[in-house]
Amino acid sequence: MNRFGTRLVGATATPPPPPKARSNENLDKIDMSLDDIIKLNRKEGKKQNFPRLNRRLQQSGTRQFRMRVRWGIQQNSGFGKTSLSRRGRVLPGKRRPYGVITGLAARKATGIRKGISPMNRPPLSDKNIERYFPALKRKTSLLRQNEVQRKQVAVLKRPNQLNRKNNIPANFTRNGNKLSHQKDTRQATFLFRRGLKVQTQLNTEQLIDDVVAKRTRQWRTSTTNGGILTVSIDNPGAVQCPVTQKPRLTRTAVPSFLTKREQSDVKKVPKGVPLQFDINSVGKQTGMTLNERFGILKEQRANLTFSKGGSRFVTVG
């Protein structure tokens, strides 16, 4: 019995308070104000929770665990799905959730805020971050600087941009001028395939400068924004007004199929096989019924058979 008694005494870390002391505490609480009672209860709760927390930390060791969210600051340590590797880099194929603060910055932030009660804590704004979390502010500014530097390095690494004299983006010159003219040519081909005649009018002054400056192939259209597309449809009823057209260049950048062809005065006869019967007669109606028609055909057959057989009877039709 003595052995068991000694073991039990050793196991209990703190002996329970005597019942008289508890009754005295309760009597004191009755005299105290509500705020003082709440503070006392909090202190007692903290004292009871501290040994439990220490045990958990000792037992966990190298286990994978995730800390809870503390007043808007999420701590995410360990090696889980959305966590970091040992060196602090994100593993390939695993994304870090947006707005997560990890590592030393998170520890500092939680350490600073331990003494402040949740009721009195200010909201997380830019000013409060500068005041209460200077480490976080530094980290975000450093990350932004690194991103800007990476973008600049990526731009400089391109060989075609290094060789250029003017640092104009490549897509600007390609897309900006040609978009309108490509649209015109597409529309022209669309209309040409459907039997409409298309004529393009171009600004000659701009074309001369462009032809001298840029070596363009013959089949390519001009790269100016001033290309005007006109579609001509035959309309004899309309009044024709004399239109003054600008003189064209000797070397045009317009495709051959877009140029207006001269209309031939002689009308071509359509090719086809001439019909041997009147097609209108097929649909004409008659007063004769089908029975009458088939009756006549039967009589004609009967006459033929009698004539072939050499019978004495003669049918008059």
Swiss-Prot record:
Residues 1-26 are annotated as: Disordered. GO terms for biological process: mRNA export from nucleus. The modification Phosphothreonine is found at residue 14. GO terms for molecular function: mRNA binding. InterPro entries: FYTTD1. Interacts with DDX39B/UAP56 and NXF1; interaction with DDX39B/UAP56 and NXF1 are mutually exclusive. Interacts with SSRP1; required for its recruitment to mRNAs. Interacts with CHTOP. Belongs to the UIF family. This is UAP56-interacting factor. The lineage of its organism: Eukaryota, Metazoa, Chordata, Craniata, Vertebrata.
